[in-house]
Amino acid sequence: MSSQDESASSSDTGEGGHVFGRENLNQSADYGYKTGSSASTHSTTDDAISEEPQPSGNGPRSIIARAYQLEMFQASMQQNIIVSMDTGSGKTQVAVLRIRAELERTPPEKRVWFLAPTVALCAQQYEVIRSQIKVANSIVMTGDDNVDSWSDVQTWDAVLANVRVVVCTYMILFEALSHAFVTMDSISLLVMDEAHNCTGKFPGRLIMKRFYMPRKSAGDHVPHILGLTASPVMKSDLSSMEDLESSLDSVCRGPTLQREELFANVHQPTMTVTTYKECDLRSPVQYTRNMNNLHLAFENLDIAEDPYVLHLMGQRTPKSLRELDRILTKLDTYTQNQMKALQRKSSSLFRELGQWAVDSYIYNVVEKVSNLDARSSWLGGWLDDEQRYLHRAIQGINALPVSAAIPAPEMTSIKLQVLLRILRGYEGSPVGIVFVKERATAGILSQLLAIIPDINARYKVGCMVGTSRYMSRKMNIHEVLQQGDDLLALEKFRSGAINLLVATSVLEEGIDVPVCNLVICFDMPANLKSFIQRRGRARMRESKLHLMIEEDSLVSVKDWGALEAAMKQRYENDMRELDHLAQVEEEDEMDVPPLHSRTTAAKVTVDDAKGHLEHFCRVVTRSQQYVDASPEYLVTTKTTAFVGGKPIPILGVTVLLPASLPPNLRQAHSSRDWISERNAKKDAALQAYKMLYEAGLINEHLLPIRESDFVDREVDGRPGLLEVQEQWNPWPCIVEAWETGLSSQTIHRRRLQLTDQDGMLMGELDALLPVPFPPISILKLYWIQHSEHPWTISFDPDVTMSGPGSTDPSFEIQQALDQTQILLDMAFGHRFSVSEQSKALRFIWPNRTLKLQMIGGQPFSKKAGEAHSSDYIIRSYGRDPYIYKSWVPVKPPLELVRGYWKAKPDEEEPPADAPWVVVKRLPKNCGFVKNSRIPIELPKEYQTSSPRRFDYIIPEQLCTFDTVPATLVQLGMLVPSITQAMEPYFVAQELLRRTALGSLDFKDIDLVMMVITSSSAGRLTNYERVEFLGDAVLKLGAAVTCATNNLHFPEGYLSLLKDRLVSNSRLCKAATALGLDQFIITRQYSLKQWRNMLTAPEPPTNTRKMSSKTLADVTEALIGAAYIEGGMSKALRCISLMIPNERWRSLDESRAVLYQVALNDIPLPSTLGPLEELLGYSFNKKSLLIEAITHASYNIPGSAGSSLERLEFLGDSVLDFVVVARLFSVKDPAPIEHYNMHLLRTAVVNGEFLGFLAMEWRTAATQRSVVVRTGQGTADELETVETPGLPLFGFLRHNASGDWVRDQQLAEERHAEMAPGIRDALEHGQRYPWDLLARLRISKVHSDVLEAVIGAVWVDSGSLEECEKLIERVGILRYLDRALRDGVKILHPKEELGRVAQNNKVVYKVDKAKRAARAEVYEVSGELAEGEDVEFLCSVTVGDRCVARVGGAVSKNDAMTKAALEVIRVWEEAGRSWDNVGVVLEEGV
């Protein structure tokens, strides 16, 4: 078992520790590490991941750990080590990797303690850890928290409850261990920052000596140790490193391999030593005016008046008298010491900076103290009288302000003038630090530099002197001016607002500052460690390090020159080593066979392989944020050989590919061992490329697979309109059946009953067909298009009236033909001949015989009209039909008549005094399946209130009437609609009979008829709703099939495959290949079409134009119909018929394959236990959950499994299907219309909404205790505070830094600010918050995590129901139900504006401008660079009017959305009218 395995085993037993230390040094350490390209993106801060800033760009930058960091991480997993790397090389990132690994492998009761020597460093490292490790609670404890007052174990237990990582100073842990508030067995890892301090009696060394070593000697558990330092040697004596190793039970380790990359990334500064002559200040004669006044005030102090002396004299005890004697001899009182310290500081400032500086300092101190209350808490005397006495002494200094606002050269020191020359002489854009020894010097020097004109023109100066351990510490008089905010200055330096920082040694160690190109040591470094730390701050290319040395210093220029010469010697040695490596590379013969394509002449050689492999990695990761695309190389030393008498390591290389690839394709090895590291990498790259080619990820041109490789040339690129077969017409076949073989035909009859809207029977007819009737039972028709209520035609069951063996069926058949012709002639004979139309669908009047003479066969008379009890038909000249209403004796006045019969020119006008008949005209078109939803206003004379109360009048002498009820004629007029209603059924039946779809055995012919009916047909139902369902079913089936059939394909390739399978072009081809095109119903009902229904088009006119989308939609609708009837299994059978060239698998089979390949026996890290509780689902294979929350940047060597992309690919389709199925299932109060289903689905599956939920959905809040300071002299109290739970996104495992951390911090800040408003809108609002979600600017990574978890649950459970429960819990379905219940407006504001604008053109104009006095904007585009203070403005024109202009937007999309909402608001306030809508300007725009 390896050391890692041993450690993991111990964690399983709850120990979580180790027993190895320095003695493991001689064990085999044959582990590799990975390296990225030397062109990788770099960080701009100390202890980040790398050194150099990446040029700004539009996309997110990606940063991963460099090879040497990963080498150190792996070494720390093997044994205790002290990581020794230069300042800024990324030691903290090594610690983050190590902490994360420790948390995952140890139980929750174990903690990691990160120790740092200073408060500022604790705060900085805590922020780094907190931002990168969110799965565990972490806290920071410093002296500022008054930890020394936590005097019982209950307080400590309460504070540390539920905490996994503690960041604190060394002293805090030492004291906690000393008092048994914390025990060693609760610590799994100790990280010791600035570990070089752990010598002598430093608390870090005492922790090891008193608590660690005894336990180790006894064989008890001890924590792992990880030290971090840039300078393990404090002095020139190398034995101090051995002492440090012994103290920390560790070995000092620095990167030993990858020399080529290390050299390429090390940027040492050019060092310059500058000497100066120090001012000789030996007597008061040389004092400045204010120094003399200070000296005089001090000399005038009478020790006998000192309050402390008077206090001792008043006690008159032996002890007080002895103390009084000592005080009088040494002048050692509080006031005397404060005045002496002020004099010393003044003298020091005079020597360092000159006359102007010291006079300004003394004057400002006096002014500051004089303005304080005599009993200010800043004055730290023992007695109140002492404070007042000191206050009076300071006020007695006759300090005068400086005479000049800007110091003249003669008023400054030679040393300051040297500094000014250095600053003035620097060329380029400076980013620098001036290191000084004393705090007072730092403050005054920064003020001086800030007022000197030519200096402040180039340098924005700040000051940092360090943060005190105790906030309540009393300040000395000489420190009262040092009240600047160190952290604020540091933040400004990091942000670029300050480019020159004057700092004390506090900035030498650890503090995260930008890389500099100018470092000036105003005072000589105290030791070698200090020199190395300061030098490490100058890490930009061509940076400068200036050492200012006093001529008479004990350390001579010669000594520093020797140091500089030694450094140059080191550079030269490094260059010689590079030359040697190049020579070795040339001698290392490259005899690796190239990669040849099997079908083309393409070839990749070993020299080409690295470039090709890098290109492949960029292609497969191009859609992934925060991911370094470079392949990473693990270099291992196999043995050692001697070349030219020099020992040379024999190397092997393993190349690691992105985590988005499956584990079996994540690494490849060099084919043999190599002397040259570069050649070994080339070999490994070629072997990896060969592996990818064999796996099918490289095409035959030896390039990464692209979209064009998936294109079916016969499918893709089809035009929008296609020429397809004419819609199949069933009626010619039916007529043929009537005309042939009647003796062998079975004649089918169904009785039709017409009832009005009240259910009253209006008439009956028997319909006959030589084929079975379609399964239609009820047909609802509107008499005219604007009828409010429909009439109902009900169909009795199909019965047989004749058939084989009948004696004389021809009589009834002929009778039906005759009666049908008469019936149709009654309805339409006055307009056209109906002889042909009567041959298809035939009718018989039950129990009656229709005769031609019944049509207008009787002349009209008043008596005849009154004899009929119901409506009947009146005809003029025996042809045009009307419904009889009444009789009038004379022609009514024309103003009372809506219409009347007019004689033709050759006809005689009937007399006005003759009788006239009042009738109602029959409509030209009737029998509509849908009524008009928009009421049409009738002409004035047809309105009910119109005085024209007579509809139409005809002279009585021209009228005849039918001897059949008017309802029979109306039934005849409905025959075309009845025929049209039957036609789709026949088409659907023929579809199933003639195509392979018949094998699916559809039971519901109504469903099939619906899904082949286009909306253009204008029928009551069409395919759109079912197509919406079928689309989701197809995409789910395609996603699952692609993932199962291509287990080694990354998500990008899977998306290309799926898109090819479900593309409209592919579905069009499937439809035409199946012969589906001629069965798609697109013809809209019309009387003209009914008249021509028996006319078959002749070639070449037997085709029609159809959009490719219609063909694709019907294909998906049939898939949806199959799902409705038989679930996913029948749907997949349907899909396999449509697209037969793919191996379609059932969901169960696919899930079984995917589950099988998921890694077994992977324990769930303890940090992820709360995640399972949040999800409400316990995984059978924990590896699936781990994969679902692993970002592609998680490039830790040895990490099992892949990243989340493939699961996210599956989860996206599962989520889409679950949402669509829920929408389709809604029936109350009515099914949701197709368009609204699209809107609702978009609302709940878009990335912004899902990302918001990934930040909202969180574990339960936890409670922990904090110590609350109640005030001086009062005991502190323990208060319980609630720590918010961790959101789903917070569990994401990643190894990104830099931009990732910044972007996520900004996202969290925006979420904290905007979440209440978004929650309110989602829970109570009547409009979907498109604008708020857009302004939140959540990255795609957030939604990817949620979808990946859904995919993982499906693969693990195989249950869509489990996924639906998860989707319900996260809040997606909950909001969907709420939006449906409350009628939330889902339409996007831009789309809504497009609708309400009607025929007016809407134009958006977006501009960008700098914004004044506001927080920084981080997301910008276009010509304004990232980080500039900009806002987006948008003006909207509707028609020819500028309606609104808004500003303050954070992106172009936000601006347009915001503007659209404003325009809608203005329009609504204007009464929903565009008339007189003025320009509305937002305030400040």
From Swiss-Prot:
Span of domain Dicer dsRNA-binding fold: 609-712
A cellular component term, taken from the record's GO annotations: cytoplasm
Keyword RNA-binding in record: yes
Binding locations of Mg(2+): E1208, D1344, E1347
EC number from the UniProt entry: 3.1.26.-, 3.6.4.-
Enzyme class, spelled out: hydrolase
Top-level lineage group: Eukaryota
UniProt record similarity statement: Belongs to the helicase family. Dicer subfamily.
Official protein name in the record: Dicer-like protein 2
